[in-house]
Each structure stands twice: as structure tokens, then as C-alpha cells.
Amino acid sequence: LPTYAQIGIWAPILLVFLRLLQGLSAGGEIGGSAVYLTEHAGSSSRGFKTSFLQLMGPLGILVSTLQIALLQSWLSPEEFLSWGWRVPFWISLILLILAFKVRMALEETPIFLQLSQSDTQSKTPLRDNFRDPETRKRMFLLFFCISAGGAVLFFCVQVYTSIFLKTAVKLPPQLVDQLSVYATLALLPLTIFAGWLSDKIGRKPVVVTGLVLGATLILPAFHLLQEIGQTATYSAGFTFAIAGILIGLSAILALVVGPQTALLAELFPTKTRNSAATLPHNLAAGWIGGLLPLIVTWLNQHWESTVAGLWYPTIFLASSAVVALLYLPETNQVNLTK
């Protein structure tokens, strides 16, 4: 993009516009991807097969972290700030072409084709979703418990840990990036395991366990990170201790997001499944996950503490756990053709 010095106020306007376009593209695909994968996955291993979709976010963070680390090691600080930061965006053009080709080659799911042939498709799915009391209730459960809970945990585990270790604990940025890579690498198989486990014992117990553990352990984990970080020995034992806490937090996140893809589709009837899953999921990511950094930062500043803001996600996760325990239905044996 042109810089502010080159085109003035149009530089940030163009950046915001492209970010909005990116958000619309990603938001429009996530629900459809979840439905598409779940309807193709079969009935006995939906949680396991669809959990691979949840790896894309952590993988994106992992790849981008490695890209930045490599560029910063190859380039001077001036070169990186001048043009080096643009390289990952150039590389993403290759992914865009590949994704477009794959997208164009995909065929509709057998369930959707059967629905099309029977002429029972909903012509106004969004309106039908809000007219049906059971669908409305399940959209709220998806929004509040599953999607918002996952967004809150994702922020705490994948985003705020790095910020906290760099700014509050004052660890070297290179060490924090290294620790973040360890945690993300651990998150990948843990997410798949959580999806598999939800096939065996049910989606609800796995998700509720993750929400409860998140509500009870987020604050103690960050307090412990701060205490260990104050030793500042940077020994192998020090690194192992910090990495262990981060991997433990990753395991909690995995319990919520592992079954999430299957749940997005299983909660709703075939004829309105895509819109019913997509709307609450994206609203939760935007409203709850998107505003979380702002709220946590404000609370930290207001209470003059580095961890006070984490009471907000703690209370939110506890509330989500209670609502999910009382009202979230078990769906791992649901018939997706209905």
C-alpha cells in the first residue's frame, strides 16, 4: 500500500477498506466451510475430521511468526520497516490463487444436493432462523457458549500471552516468539485430539470442560507466568516452566475449539444450516473477541494492574460454562439430513 507520506489520509482509509474486505471474505467462508466439512465427514468421526479446520488459525499465526522472524534475521531494522513487512502479503497472493482454484473445484455435499432435488430449500433462511424458537435458542447458545467462548480463549491463549510476556514480564521478544511457537505446535495435535474425544464422549462434556478450566485457570496461569518471569534466569528450566504453562493453556483452548466445527453444523436443520451457523459465529468473533483486547487493556489501566483485565474473560467463560451445562444439547449423534 502507498504510505501516508505518498497519498495522505487515503493510506489509512485504504488499509481499513482492505481489512474490511478481508473480514467479509473470511467471515463469509468460515460457516460455510464448517457446514461443508461436517456434511462430508460421515456420522462416526465428524468431530475428528472437522477439527482440522480449527488448525488454520493457529497455523496462520505460526507461519506468520516464522516469516517475521526470518525476515528480521535477514534484513536490517530499516529495511524491514521500509519494505520487509510487505513480503508476507506478497506471499499470500500465491495462497489466494491456490484457494480460488480449490474453491472452484469443490462440489456440493450430497446432503445439499438431496435438499435441492426435494425442493425444500428455504428461500429466506435468515428470517426462518429467527422465526423458529428452537433455532433462535441454538443460535444464542452458539454465540454465547461455543463461538464467544472460543474467541475469548483464543485471545487469552494465542494473543495476550505474547503481549503479557513482552510488556508485563519483560521477556526478550525473541524468547517470547520461541515460546509461542512451542505452544502453537502443541495446540495442533491437542485440537485434533479434542475433536476425536468429542466423537467418543460427546461434544458437550468436552466443550463445558474447556470453558470451566478456562474460567478457573486463566488468572492463576498469568499470575504464575508473572512470578516465574520475575526470576529472569532464562535457564532451560525457566524456558520449560513457561512453555509448560503456555501448553497447558493451549490444551484448554483445544477442548473448546476442537469440537467447534462439528457443533456449528450439528446444531441446525439442513435447510437453514449455513446462515444459522455463520451469523452468530461471526458476531461472537467480532463483538466478543474483537472488543476483548480493548476491554482488557482498559481494565488493566483502570486498576493499574497487568492482570486485572483478565477478570473479564474469566467471568465471561464462567457464565458460558453455566449456560452450556444447562442448555447446550448433545449433537454428536444427530442426523444431518434432517
Please report, for each region that a protein language model flagged, where it lies by residue.
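Hydrophobic core of transmembrane alpha-helices in multi-pass small-molecule transporters
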Residues: 4-27, 233-255
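Flexible cytoplasmic inter-helical loops of multi-pass small-molecule transporters
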Residues: 104-125, 334-338
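Extracytoplasmic gate region of multi-pass secondary transporters
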Residues: 135-187, 288-293
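Glycine-rich segments within core transmembrane alpha-helices of 12-TM secondary carriers
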Residues: 48-72, 95, 280-292
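Cytoplasmic membrane-interface "Motif A"-like loop-to-helix N-cap segments
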Residues: 200-211
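Helix-loop-helix hairpin linking two adjacent transmembrane segments in secondary transporters
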Residues: 57-103
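C-terminal ends and interior cores of transmembrane alpha-helices
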Residues: 1-8, 212-234
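A late C-terminal transmembrane helix in Major Facilitator Superfamily
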Residues: 271-303
